[in-house]
C-alpha cells in the first residue's frame, strides 16, 4: 500500500509542487512513481483542441504520449533546456563553436525522437478513429496528421543540423 500526497509549499516567495510517497520525497521515490503509474487528464477546454493554436495541440499530443511513456516529459524538458542553452550561447559575444555544435547535435537527436513519438501517437489515434468509424458505421472519416516541414521533407539528422547552423544569425535576435 502506498500513500501518495501532492501539495504545494512556499519556498523563496514561490510555490513549489511537492510529491511524497509514504512521506518520502526523494528522487528515488519520484522515479518509482513515474515508472509505476501512467495517467492522463482530460479537461473541458480540450474540446476546442482543433480550434486552438498548434502549440496547444502539440501539448495535448505530448500528454497522450506521456500517458504510455513515463520518461517522455524528461525528453521534452531536456529538449527545451537545450534550446534555451543554445539561445544563451548565441547571444553571448564569444562562444565556443564545439560547445554550440554539441548542443545543436543534442537538439537534433531529441527533436527527431520527439517527432517520431508524436507521429507514432498520431498513427495510433488514427487507427482508433478508424476502428470507431467501422464499429459504429460513421459516415465520415477523420484523419489526423502533422503538417510541417519535417513531414514534407522527412528531415534527417544532417538536414536538421544544417538548418540549425544556417539559422544561427536569425535565432541570435531572440
Where are the model-predicted features located?
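Long, charged N-terminal accessory/stalk domains
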Residues: 48-50, 56-95, 105
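Generic structural signal of hydrophobic/aromatic residues within well-ordered alpha-helices
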Residues: 33, 37, 53, 86, ...
Amino acid at each position: 500500500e502506498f500513500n501518495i500526497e501532492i501539495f504545494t509549499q512556499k519556498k523563496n516567495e514561490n510555490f513549489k509542487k511537492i510529491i511524497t510517497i509514504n512521506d518520502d520525497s526523494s528522487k528515488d521515490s519520484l522515479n518509482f512513481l513515474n515508472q509505476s503509474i501512467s495517467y492522463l487528464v482530460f479537461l473541458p477546454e480540450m474540446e476546442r483542441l482543433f480550434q486552438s493554436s498548434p502549440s496547444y495541440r502539440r501539448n495535448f499530443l505530448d500528454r497522450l504520449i506521456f500517458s504510455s511513456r513515463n520518461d517522455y516529459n524528461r525528453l521534452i524538458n531536456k529538449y527545451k533546456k537545450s534550446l534555451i542553452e543554445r539561445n544563451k550561447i548565441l547571444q553571448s559575444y564569444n562562444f565556443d563553436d564545439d560547445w554550440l555544435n554539441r548542443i545543436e547535435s543534442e537538439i537534433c537527436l531529441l527533436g527527431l525522437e520527439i517527432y517520431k513519438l508524436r507521429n507514432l501517437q498520431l498513427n495510433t489515434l488514427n487507427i482508433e478513429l478508424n476502428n470507431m468509424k467501422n464499429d459504429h458505421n460513421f459516415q465520415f472519416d477523420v484523419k489526423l496528421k502533422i503538417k510541417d516541414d519535417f513531414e514534407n521533407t522527412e528531415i534527417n539528422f544532417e538536414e536538421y543540423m544544417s538548418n540549425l547552423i544556417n539559422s544561427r544569425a536569425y535565432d541570435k535576435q531572440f
